[in-house]
Structure formats: C-alpha cells, structure tokens
Amino acid sequence: DALPILYTIAQTEGCLVAGTGNRSEISMGYFTKWGDGGYDINPIGDLTVREVYEFLAYFNAPQSIRTKKPSAGLWEGQTDEGELGISYDEIDDYLLKGVATSAVKQRIDKSLKITQHKKKLIIYPD
C-alpha cells in the first residue's frame, strides 16, 4: 500500500521513486511486482549482493549494516536466503562467474524463467 503514497509524494515534489533491489534479488524474482519492484530508477539494480557489500565497505558504512543478513523483514528471524533456499554467495557466483553446482544452476535458471513476467513492462494490445 506504500506505492501510491510514494508516487503521490514524488508527483507533488517533482521527483522519481527510487528502488533498492539488487541484481541478485531481481534475477531471482525476489520482489513484489507492484510493491518493492515498483520504482522509476534503481541505482543499485545492476549490483549483486556481494557488490553491494563491497560498496558499503568501500564507503565505510556502519558495521551493523555491513554484517546484517539480508531480510525483507516479513517476520521475526526471516532471511532472504532462508526463503530462497539458496545463498547469495551461490547466486552471485553464478551471475558473476557462471560457476555453480548442478542443483544451484537448476534452481537459479528456474527462478530466472518463472519470474520473467516481473521484469517486463505491462503488455497490452496494440
């Protein structure tokens, strides 16, 4: 329900809505299509989770941020990796180097395929 509010504020202020999803999450389709996936620009959309942490370290972000487990905060103790059933290290190794076990490749390739609709603009008839 936050998206209409964000866009109302952006329109009023003449701004764009910025996204916070990274390449690892986007590749896996780990976002809500018209929720956290709704934005105009995404400055970190091409960075993997590994690269986001490297970026944070480079700019001396507080240690508490750099060591926090990625979580959508949906419930106490929830983690992205727990929900995905795969680690971001495994995802990033595959995305960056093409290196993964057969099981990991299958998992990622399946997610890439079944979440394609989340990554496309609205389809409508001509």
Map each language-model feature to its residues:
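ATP/NTP-dependent adenylation/nucleotidyl-transfer catalytic domains that generate, transfer
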Residues: P4-D126
